[in-house]
């Protein structure tokens, strides 16, 4: 039985809804690449069927206000890419984000296909499927959060599921919880009953937002939901929904009471020990994350003023951020201040695509709201009952999504849901008064045989097929294959199969051809693997030289690329282990790095290490002090200063800096150094740091009984009964001579005689 094209498109759309489940550890950036690749394959197959339907007259391309704004936005981001700082990166993006013009165009194409083929009933079927899919998705996320493992995704400290990021999960469930609310209201309209099964899904999916601890998601969902209930309470169009009005008023009052109670108890153990409530009550512009986002938005605005019309180009926020970096971000978030996104979607759009990009982006929301407001006005018309409620929910979805995006950026799951919802809204607005159609192919009057229409149809099909085939092979499948090969190369490096790794690397570069975005992913991926998994040796010289050469080629296009320059310096440092002349090259590269990012602590830390290796101790000290002026919590800088004073035979200052290095988590490589620093900390009774040090020592020498004895005593000093007993017993297991002392120690612990525990 031959399936109609529309039916096939419907099932392909459902297949798109399952792409958020796709995670593969065999690709570089496992939570990103497979989802984006499969979605693009599905959309391009859908596009071919769609063109076939148009040619056969089974559907028409309808243009209303919303679809026109999307076309304008698609054009603006292309112009911005051409005028930006790196067209390749703007157009194709990389493995880490898989967005760019090419990625966004796929979502816009997805919108046009579903908006022109499906009617409202089709969309309702898709939405129902999506709500149940998301409910299952949330269930699996909870299993993973509880310690389970599903596929390659294992337990995470926060609820994130297959997204890999709690914030991504939050926005996904903003859409789905409110879609469930849409079906709840539809059922309510029919039954007039407050409770129906959809309410359970609304509550369940809303709770997942709060369990994830995503504050932007909480705010987005909260304001979207608030918009619905206040509209039901105060809007004249809601006057016939008396029961909903009462329920909304009750919900509003209950919500105010709940928030008031939670915030008044924010300093109590009840709130502090509940992760979701603690995250909720920590919402503040003074919170480090909030302050960092605000500073990044200021940087985005400063960058916009440099390129006000079409911006720096999509995906090119990183160079803008580096050039206009605000050092205050380091003080606020010392461990996470390097942004390749503004973490504020509107401001990022402004910086990367300029004022024209931002206006066209905002017009998408304006057009969608205009359609929904027009839909509300149909409430009193025959066969239009309930339109006010339904439009209200979709307005809330757009509000929640937009608010959440003020705190983050878009990604696969958010784009998928956004353009799916836009497709539905577009169909709601498809009336003769609000839309126009692309004319069908002309038909002759039958008196003469006109082959032009048929030839035109055939030509359109051939061109479409060729374009889609080329796009799939070169722009979709090839990047996926290269992503997999990056991981294969990294695995070879971890096995110390260096010859095979080098051959795989060269083969991957050859496959990438002239696509700079792919070459950059390959080079950065392998350089990061060198930093994390490879012990430098002279037989790696050809590999390292090749990496440096490729890095130099990429830097001709992106001289501002901090990561490339940093990696180059690290590789040169590796080579200096067998070629002392390379240390000077590393120094020059590090000095170039200072010009790119003078306010980055890592920049000066690298220089401090290089100067120390060159035995230029005064310069090393100067750079280490610069690091601490930028980030007073940098453990390595304290360690370098400790080495400096130790070299100067100034033991008092050396010990002071070594102790600070320990407090901020420096990983010492020498067991004796750890013991000496721990002894210094005993005088200050800093048992928390002592415990961290002795745990490091166990990793260095797991058979040293004395370390277990000291660790047991340290845990005893902080009244951690369970761990004190555990390590005392371990000491006795390793050396039976400690058995009696261990039993005496445990007796002290059991009796609560903490003061008698020796240091």
What are these regions (language model features)?
Residues 477-494, 506-536, 557-578, 599-609, ...:
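Amphipathic alpha-helical repeat scaffolds of TPR domains
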Residues 1-99, 109, 113-132, 183-199, ...:
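Transmembrane signal-anchor hairpin modules in multi-pass inner-membrane enzymes, especially those
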